[in-house]
Amino acid sequence: MANPSLQQVLEGLQGRFRPEAIDREIIYYLSLGEAPGDKWTVTLSPSGCSMVPGRVGTAHCVLKTSADLFMRLVDGTYQPNALDFMRGKLKTNDLDLLLRLRKAFGIG
């Protein structure tokens, strides 16, 4: 079962989606904990966004962090810095696409 507060945060992001920030389909895999409800696939395209629990397809960008840190990032109470990546609080395979995710939802 999905983490209810995490699921609510992700559903809230859909209303903040800015399609003009995306020029092609980009698939993100969010690994936000160890429980099945902490893992999500987010697909963004110029025509919309979708979010489904679990891993679906091959992601262009993977973000691994805690659900708490992700929710704080979304609500603006946390601003990541380079040290957070060096310490492993946030892990990604593509920083540029991660920044594009933030822009697509008006985060930060």
Model-predicted segments: where are they?
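Feature captures hydrophobic
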Residues: 1-108
